[in-house]
A protein has these predicted regions:
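Extended polybasic, low-complexity segments that bind anionic RNA or targeting/receptor surfaces
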Residues: 1-46, 93-209
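A polyanion-binding, active-site-adjacent surface
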Residues: 39, 43-56, 60-63, 75, ...
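Glycine/serine-rich anion-binding loops at beta->alpha junctions
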Residues: 54-91
Length: 209
């Protein structure tokens, strides 16, 4: 069983938190981690590029000039790709699918590898509770300063906490996620992982069925 000292916000006794060894002490596997991260990045990708083909551009309803007798090359439509303003041949379309499907056990193992690496690098902070009585961004910034959090931070919550979510919404590089939805990509991209004690239990119950 892995142990981690609870990070205190106020002056009170610091406790040792027992962390599941099979979640927070998994050996590093670079290939597996890369596979899961690339898959999740691809699944979040938004397809923007969409070139217009000859069937999408304006004009071309009439033959530009007659077939013979002009001395010029024959043309059938102004929408031809060889004309300025014509359609694009073999251009990118928004019908492309980048989604990559991985087995659940692979995604789960990737998450455990990512959490374990954060644990080994002391980039995981466990706190007793992060519940806020009111929506206050300034108060949340002060709390993060007390916890000595620098850079990007992922706050893992055991359940939806609207006060906390709204308080962190305008803080740069700080994001929140429910423990049941935690994933490898979000863990890897954050510098520090801040987990509520109850959040650890939710992670164990969700991913170690």
């Amino acid at each position: 069983m892995a142990t981690k000292k609870e990070t205190k916000i106020e002056e009170k006794k610091v406790e040792d938190i027992n962390l599941p060894k099979d979640i927070f002490e998994v050996p590093m596997n670079v290939d597996l981690l890369h596979q899961v991260v690339v898959s999740q990045m691809a699944n979040r990708r938004t397809v923007i590029a969409d070139a217009r083909g000859r069937g999408d551009v304006r004009g071309g309803g009439i033959k530009p000039w007659k077939q013979k007798g002009t001395g010029r090359a024959r043309q059938g439509s102004r929408r031809s790709p060889i004309w300025i303003g014509g359609g694009v041949t073999h251009g990118p379309t928004n019908e492309r699918i980048f989604k990559k499907v991985l087995p659940k056990n692979i995604k789960r193992k990737g998450l455990f590898v990512a959490l374990s690496e954060k644990y080994r690098n002391n980039d995981i902070k466990i706190i007793d509770s992060l519940e806020l009585k009111e929506i206050k961004t300034k108060g949340m910034i002060e709390t993060l300063k007390k916890l000595e959090i620098k850079g990007s931070c992922l706050i893992v919550l055991p359940k939806v906490d609207n006060n906390l979510i709204l308080s962190t919404r305008n803080i740069p590089k700080v994001s929140t996620i429910q423990a049941k939805d935690i994933n490898c990509l979000d863990v890897v991209t954050a510098k520090t992982i801040l987990i509520d004690k109850e959040g650890v239990k939710v992670i164990k119950e969700t991913f170690k069925k």
